């Protein structure tokens, strides 16, 4: 549905959403167009993105995984750029969700304006190994969740917060 953008540089290296956020964020920040000099990412973003941002003074906020959470944070705090490693990139001045075509156009703008290759632009970020571990959970999770939810509801009721 064209809501994501993953690029490939001239050397065949995949440029994922983290790299795109860095490239576009840095470009917008240099132009004074990045609100709060901040991008919004998710907890799945690579450590290399954060280290590269720190190096240039670009701030970041993390959300839960999901472009919905990224957009909520952007809207709440007035940020204009956010996204996910998966390529969901949101430019809130233009759309409320990821737009792959818009993202690809901004990447091309950065390449043309800075007169640098995509490999050079992305090369400022050192990507670190990032294992993803899936944990299998027994079917009893519904019972556990119900107990947890019930205990939270009880605390809320006990504190008189239901009115």
Task: Report each predicted region and the residues it spans.
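A conserved helix-loop-strand patch within extracytoplasmic ligand-binding domains
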Residues: 23-33
């Amino acid at each position: 549905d064209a809501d994501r953008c993953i690029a490939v540089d001239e050397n065949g290296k995949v440029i994922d959403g983290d790299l795109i956020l860095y490239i576009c964020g840095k470009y917008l920040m240099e132009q004074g167009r990045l609100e709060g000099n901040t991008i919004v990412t998710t907890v799945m973003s690579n450590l290399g993105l954060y280290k590269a941002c720190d190096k240039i003074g670009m701030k970041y906020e993390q959300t839960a995984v999901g472009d919905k959470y990224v957009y909520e944070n952007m809207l709440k705090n007035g940020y204009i750029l956010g996204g996910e490693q998966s390529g969901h990139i949101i430019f809130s001045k233009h759309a409320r969700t990821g737009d792959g075509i818009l993202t690809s156009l901004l990447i091309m703008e950065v390449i043309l304006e800075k007169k640098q290759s995509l490999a050079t632009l992305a090369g400022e970020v050192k990507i670190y190994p990032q294992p993803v571990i899936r944990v299998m959970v027994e079917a009893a999770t519904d019972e556990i969740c119900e107990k947890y939810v019930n205990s939270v509801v009880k605390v809320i009721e006990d504190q008189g917060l239901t009115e």
